[in-house]
Amino acid sequence: MEGDSYGNATTINGTPVNHQPLERHRLWEVITIAAVTAVVSLITIVGNVLVMISFKVNSQLKTVNNYYLLSLACADLIIGIFSMNLYTTYILMGRWALGSLACDLWLALDYVASNASVMNLLVISFDRYFSITRPLTYRAKRTPKRAGIMIGLAWLISFILWAPAILCWQYLVGKRTVPPDECQIQFLSEPTITFGTAIAAFYIPVSVMTILYCRIYRETEKRTKDLADLQGSVSVTKAEKRKPAHRALFRSCFRCPRPTLVQRERNQASRSSSHRSTSITGKPSQATGPSTNWAKAEELTTCSSYPSSEDEDKPATDPVLQVVYKSQGKESPGEEFSAEEAEETFVKGQTDKNDCDSPDYFLSPAAAHRPKSQQCVAYKFQLVVKADGTQETNNGCHKVKIMPCSFPVAKEPSTKGLSPNLSHQMTKRKRMVLVKERKAAQTLSAILLAFIITWTPYNIMVLVSTFCDKCVPVALWHLGYWLCYVNSTVNPICYALCNRTFRKTFKMLLLCQWKKKKVEEKLYWQGNSKLP
C-alpha cells in the first residue's frame, strides 16, 4: 500500500495487524468523502422515488413523454442505491473486499443502468423530434403501449451489450486476470477497447442527441413565428368581419324531363305562391336553350377535405361548383352578412352531355382565386323546373342527392376563410400545443445539458489515457467516474425546474399534503353529487 504515514499498525504475538483499512486517505478526507457521497446518494434516492410516486398519484403526469422519464428515474435510482455507495466504499478502502462475484454483479448492474440512462435519453430525443416534425403521423402512433415497448428495448439492448460480457468474459478466455483486491471489467484492460466503448456508449449518442435537439429547437422557433403570424392574421377589424356574400350561379343539367306546355302554364300561374330560396340564386335560361334545372338546398352536411394535385386536372364533364348558402330566415336582396353566417363551399356537379349543350356551371368571382384548402358540402337538392322568363318555382319535381366530393386530406389545414370564432379556437389550440411542446423541449434540453456536463470529463480522460497511460491521476479518475453518477442526482431536479406539475407534486409529497388534497377532492365531489 502507498503512504506508510496513513497506516496505524500494531503487533499481536509478533504478527503485524493493521487497524486502519483506509490507509490511502487521512481521517478528515474519509469523513468528508463519506459525508458528501452519502448526502448525494440520499438526494438521488429521494428525488427519483419522488418522480415514481408523483407519476403514480398524479394522473396529469401520466403522459407518454413522462413514461420515458419514469424509466430514466428507475435507472437513476439503481445508481443511487448501489453504484454510488459501493464505489465510494471501494475508493475509501483502496481495495475491493467483497469478492469477485459481487464485483462482477456490481459492474454489470452499474454499466447496464448507466447505459440504460443513455438509451432512454436517446429515445426521449427521438420522441421529441418526431413529435415536432411529424405531428400528424407520429402522434397517432405515440401510445403508452408503444412507449413501453421502446423502454423495454432500451433496457434489453443495454443488458445484452454489457451483462453477458462482464459476467462471462473470464469463462470465455479461460481465466480471470483481474487481481482479487481490484474490481474492474476484464475486457476493458486494453486501452483501445476502452476507447471504442467510450465512442459507442457516449460520443455517438451525444452527437445524435445534439443534432436532434438543434432540429427540435429550429422547428419550435419556426412554429412560434408561424403562430405569431397566424394570430396577426385573425385579428381583423369589425368592418372586415362583415363582408358581402358572393352569389354563385348554379346551373347544371340533370336527368329531369323537359316541362310540358301545361306545366309551363301552371308555373306562370303560381308566381304569387313562391318559396324563398335559402342557398342558390339564378337567372332564367334562354328560350332557345335546353331546360334548365334550378335547385333549392334542403339539407347540407359539411366535412373538411383538401384536394391533391390530381384534383386539379378534372375534366370539364365533372365540374366543381362554388355555392354560397345562408341560414333560414336571414336572406334579403342586397343584404350583407358576416362570415359566421355564410360559408363558401365547393360541390361537384354531375352532368350529362346528352341532356344539354349549354355550359354546365358558372362560378362567382371568388371562385377564381380559391385557395387549395376547401370544404366539401353534401347537399340534398330539390329540382325545380322553371319556365322561360319566370321567377317562381314549382315543387313538383324529383329529388336528386349530390354526393360529397372525396378529396384526400392535406397535412395542415389553414384557418383562412373560416369564421373568426373558429379561427380563434384553432389558434388557441395551436398555441396550447406549442406551449406543451416548448415545455417538453426545455425539459429535454436541461436533461441533455446535465448529461453532457457530468459525463464529458470522464470520457475525455478515457481518450487521454489511450495515448498516455500515466497522464491522468488516480484521484482525477475517481472524481470523473463519480461525476457520471451525479447525473442521476441532477435529473429529478431538472424535472422539477422545467415542469410545474412535477414541482407542485414534489412539494405536496414532501410536505405530506397529497393525502389531504385527495380527501378535499373527494369531499368536493361528494358535495357536488348531493346538490339537486
Swiss-Prot record:
- Per the UniProt topology annotation, the Extracellular ranges are 1-29, 88-104, 170-191, 465-478
**Which of the residues bear the PTM Phosphothreonine?**
501, 505
Protein's membrane topology: Multi-pass membrane protein
Q: Give GO terms for biological process.
A: adenylate cyclase-inhibiting G protein-coupled acetylcholine receptor signaling pathway; chemical synaptic transmission; G protein-coupled receptor signaling pathway, coupled to cyclic nucleotide second messenger; gastric acid secretion
- Bias category Polar residues: which stretches? 280-294
Glycosylated residues (UniProt): 8
Membrane-crossing residues?
Answer: 30-53, 67-87, 105-126, 147-169, 192-214, 444-464, 479-498
UniProt protein name: Muscarinic acetylcholine receptor M5
